[in-house]
Amino acid sequence: MGTVHGVWLKYVALSGLSFAGYSYFSESSEDEDRSSAFSLLGLTVTRSTLPALAWGYSTAVNGVIAILFKLEWGMSILGKDTVQGTIPWWSYVVWFPFHIPTYLYTNIHKFISRYKNPETDVYEPVPVATQVQTGWWIGGCHGHELHKDWSAVIDLTVEFPESCRTVAYLAIPTWDGVPASPAQLEHAAAWAVQQHDKYGGDILVHCAHGRGRSTTVLCACLVKAGLFETWQQAFEEGIKPKRPVCKLNKRMRENLTQWQELYVAKGK
């Protein structure tokens, strides 16, 4: 969730913990006094039955999510509206074993995260968003806390609704730690430059924490805008000096390299 490496393993762990809860309450249900039990649809229900069912459901949901993360499939199953950036109420009901821990982790991570400010050499809270080049910002899902009116927002999250005020909005939902494809990078970069030229002002590229997914897309944007010749320069010289917490995993680097070969090198 908060890192760009092995995110899917966190949902494997959640599934495992949920199974432990399911096993505990299932055994408790068998040992309980049946005098307070009641029948529902032909099944005997005790005080431990509902918790056991909830933990069992959480085991299945987080197991499925972990598989989808690993396969880089199913970004649409949460029902996020890619036009408005909203997530429907039913998603929170059906996928609550995913939404609840994701929401808690992200907010706790935001609260405790610190970084060494390169300008002051002092450890400070990680900003919800950082301007790394004039008019180009990178951040997490709490960018609305800056109370800015953005010219354009690129949203890489599949797990959070969009909460920023913006003139133009582009959603490319991806699982945490999973990069946009080379084609998606080209689309996002071209779109961002077009909005920047059209409206001026500030462009925000964000994921959940402003570290991996958003960094991948912003590298492409900065190259497309003509600020840097390669994504490597955009990352090392254009982004990381201002926001040191930004990272790129192996898949992100591979996709950026493929994007550069397909859409940048051929255009020269």
Region roles according to the model:
Residues R213-C221:
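Hydrolases whose catalytic domains are alpha/beta-hydrolase-1, hotdog thioesterase
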Residues G210:
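Conserved G/P- and acidic residue-centered "switch" motifs that form tight phosphate/ATP-binding loops
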